[in-house]
Amino acid sequence: MIYTVTFNPSLDYVVDVKDFKLGIVNRTVQETIFPGGKGINVSTVLKNLGYDSTALGFTAGFVGNEIIRLLNEKGVDTDFIPVEKGVSRINVKLRSNEESEINGQGPKIEEADIKKLYKQLDGLSEGDVLVLAGSIPNVMPSSMYMDIMDYLKEKDIKIVVDATRDLLTNVLPYHPFLIKPNNHELGEIFGVEISDKDDVIKYAKKLQEQGARNVLVSMAGDGAVLVSEDGQEFKAEAPVGKVKNSVGAGDSMVAGFVSGYLSTGDYKQAFMYGVCTGSASAFSEELATKAEVEALLDRSKNLF
């Protein structure tokens, strides 16, 4: 079974406004509402690819109810913990001459709520996959990812971590199955500027030395790199296409890698599927579908 954790899910309200101006009434030309959050994106793409997962995390109020409704409508199973104080956040994404975002805070998550999450994690068993993705709300301990991995260390669970800076490096001693920084985040960790794929491989191996089993590094238009636990190194150029929406591309890469690995047990195949899933989402207004991913795979095999 696959589980994803999104600590602070959102309802993303995306509006397109022609020539937006401050201080006057602006009218939208297009608007979209969808559930947001990195773990939620992973669960959504997994469902599109034919893999069931359960989305975990915390929701509150009428916004939380709508997040759950929209996910269930997409066929995504949810088991969010209801939080009594506050309301799940609404994030406004304004697209005009420039793109701007206003992100909400989210509910007040208390110790009792966190204990309920640990009780859910007790139900995980050998061979399960757990995806920890995104930031941690400031109302929760900053050590949350590390605490979860410590809590589960006696179980043979494949844990995937898609986070930045300390959230990522602090979990390395617990040997996560997969981590997915981008090239800029990788450079920030080591205080260097990453200039090419050879640099990526060099510093990805340093993360392996610190405990990561597999390191998948996205490089936007420059492609991606995988350094796997069996000593293999894989490089890929970026598939060719017109970028329409970069939101969720990294999460889609994680979902593609997980589904590819579970279906084949082969790191190269997982890497190919991850890269093409991430790109398929970037080339679409919405998150990638299985048909879009497979079509991109068929015409991109020369890139690997």
Protein language model annotation of sequence segments:
Residues 2, 51-54, 78-79, 159, ...:
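Hydrophobic anchor at the start of a short beta-strand
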Residues 101-103, 128-134, 162, 180-185:
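Short beta-strands and strand-loop turn motifs
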Residues 1-56, 64-66, 304:
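Glycine-rich phosphate/adenosyl-contacting loop at the front of the ribokinase-like
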